Curated annotation (Swiss-Prot):
GO terms for biological process: DNA replication. ATP binds at G228, P229, T230, R231, T232, G233, K234, S235. It holds the Pfam family Gemini_AL1_M. This is Replication-associated protein. It is found in: Host nucleus. It comes from Maize streak virus genotype E (isolate Pat) (MSV). Residues 251-269 are annotated as: Transactivation.
């Protein structure tokens, strides 16, 4: 998994730490012993570390580390070992994380006793610093000492039962900000297989600078527009390129992943695509309004969008001259030829002569 964006300050505070070391062939036991020593001051209680194989044959490691006291650090390199840098996340559900780590291991190492957290965690939360704290001081204490989303909401419910009952959505919002959900490792929904995926030479020229290379400082990527018949494999091809945000039917910003390399807008009519200029223009740091959510700033770096449309929903036919001018200036336009496919036909077995 990709690490957090460098544009955001790093803060990790949790008694349950989930680590992923991509492209790491190290022995799980060696990694576990070094991690155990790294968190000695927080009193480690349990660790499980497993080595798995990517579909491309490369190895990666997952580890769940549980400590008596929450690990508190602003050092994004604290868990670096032998030159390997992990993705660091707070384990929202230690039971699910442990099951995820142990699903298909090639090698496993465990130390200590696993601590399942099925209900509100009581733990060793320190007492309030003063005898009669006010509401703000209690809330600050909860924010400072909660180690998970579940514990945070449990403490709020205990200290402010009326506010919890009437303003739960606001507490859930702050809990999600303090303890983001775990981003599972991306696995392409369309891995290389038979029949092989393919694309036009002109699109190959677009791929290199816009998907496979980082943008130069101050520059912007270029988007790609593909229009053509249905059932030609264009969606399968577009989704095979790497980690992406995928939207079909509507654009839902609530699940937007900043670590994605590119966006895909698939079969959404032009009039129903909000922020189309920002997406097509690969703009940075624009504000969106997710449904049932608060406005937020997204796309901290220039990111291309692949727009896929069938011939009957051709965006260019719906645009004003001014919109079309912007579209053509910021997007490579590819109109499919009759009979064109995005995959090679499967090879038929040779027929025997009679």
């Amino acid at each position: 998994m990709a690490s957090s964006s460098s544009n955001r300050s790093f803060l990790h505070r949790n008694a349950n730490t989930f680590l992923t070391y991509p492209h790491c062939p190290e022995n799980p036991e060696i990694i576990s012993q070094k991690l155990w020593d790294l968190v000695a001051r927080w009193n480690p209680l349990y660790i499980v570390c497993a080595r798995e194989a990517h579909r491309d044959g490369n190895m990666h490691l997952h580890a769940l580390l549980q400590t008596d006291k929450p690990v508190r650090t602003t050092d994004a390199r604290i868990f670096d070992i032998e030159g390997f840098h992990p993705n660091i996340q707070s384990a929202k559900s230690v039971n699910k994380v442990r099951d995820y780590i142990l699903k298909e291991p090639l090698a496993v190492f465990e130390r200590g006793t696993f601590i399942p957290r099925k209900s509100c965690f009581q733990g060793n939360t320190p007492p309030f610093p003063k005898k009669n704290p006010n509401k703000d001081e209690i809330m600050a204490h909860i924010i400072s000492h909660a180690t998970s989303k579940q514990e945070y909401l449990c403490l709020v419910r205990k200290e402010f039962p009326y506010d919890w009952a009437t303003k739960l959505q606001y507490f859930e919002y702050s809990a999600n900000k303090l303890f983001p959900d775990i981003q599972e490792e991306f696995i392409s929904p369309h891995p290389p297989s038979s029949p092989d995926l393919l694309c036009n030479e002109s699109i190959k020229d677009w791929l290199q600078p816009n998907i496979y290379q980082p943008a130069d400082e101050g520059s912007r990527k270029q988007s790609l527009y593909i229009v053509g018949p249905t059932r030609t494999g264009k969606s399968t091809w577009a989704r095979s390129l790497g980690l992406h945000n995928y939207w079909q039917n509507n654009v839902d910003w609530s699940s937007y992943n900043e670590d994605a390399i590119y966006n895909i807008v698939d079969d959404i009519p032009f009039k129903y695509c909000p922020c189309w200029k920002q997406l097509v223009g690969c703009q940075k740091e624009f504000v969106v309004n997710p449904k049932y959510g608060k406005k937020k700033k997204v796309q901290m770096k220039s990111k291309p969008t692949i727009i896929l449309a069938n011939s009957d929903e051709d965006w260019m036919k719906e645009m004003t001259p001014g919109q079309l001018e912007y579209f053509e200036a910021n997007c490579m336009i590819y109109v499919m030829s009759p009979g064109e496919k995005w995959y090679s036909p499967p090879q038929l077995p040779p027929t025997e002569e009679v």
